[in-house]
């Protein structure tokens, strides 16, 4: 391992240490390069000011799904608020996005270190797993082979900090019962807990959305953890998935948690993954809360619009996206 990688690894270990409750001056940067894509996540601070977690991406058009995922991933810090709205800039060939998140110095420093690593791994180096036309099949995780992946210059960091822990059985497996209980308390129906995880349904009027938490399905690079799927009965179109991501970025009250809308085999699917490296007591409860919030947002998108709700700019709503959702919904459920 070269000296640069060794230094980053040492710093990342400190950030991932759950016993580290306070840090008055966090400084570190992580960058990965993949195929036509570069992603950076930087943690920095100034004296007497709270640390800032800055996550940014600059890439060729065609990887917009990963771009949106970066901002969604950055919002995982539940106790943080965006210091400014997600800012997107465009030109004829490139797209960029940066999000700054102030970190509570009493909480979350280990989370920030994890994010800096996983943001790069899940979105940059593994760009072919982006949610637009690649091998990603959300509903059965048929992620294909590793053909075409560019090795990370910091592969040893990934191996030690993330993949190593991923070789263990899912640490989230012990929370399956708690996840099921929380889903029942959220008034979801047909809640079922089994050896592979938990599933439940969300009422969408004449149809339902399916919410699943799987602990037996490993990530192809990060190993075991917790996969979360929210599948809705809309056409699984990559452009619609991208617009769903854009709408999510524009919400005045953001929905926390990493992930991205993608193409599933039975419908449009929001997919997120939490590897063993991030596991802490209580995290599963947060994950359920974020997922239920997203499901209720979908109810508002589909039912609130299709069944007579108003459409406007409140809450970051985007009229063209809502119109496309209405058209697809009506087409899928038209009476013969």
Annotate each language-model stretch with its function.
Residues 1-68, 75-81, 282-290, 294-336:
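Hydrophobic, helix-prone linear segments
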Residues 27-63, 196-238, 243:
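Hydrophobic-cavity lipid-handling domains and compact docking modules
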Residues 141-156, 248-253, 312-327:
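Unusually extended, aromatic-enriched hydrophobic runs near protein termini
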Residues 54-98, 223-275:
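Short, internal acidic amphipathic alpha-helical interface segments
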Residues 84-120, 124-138, 256-293, 297-311, ...:
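Well-ordered alpha/beta subsegment
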Residues 63-69, 105-114, 218-223:
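Intrinsically disordered, low-complexity coil segments
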Residues 1-42, 78-94, 105-112, 127-216, ...:
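Charge-rich, low-complexity N-terminal segments
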Residues 51-60, 116-126, 163-169, 220-231, ...:
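Short, surface-exposed, charge-dense and proline/glycine-enriched linear segments
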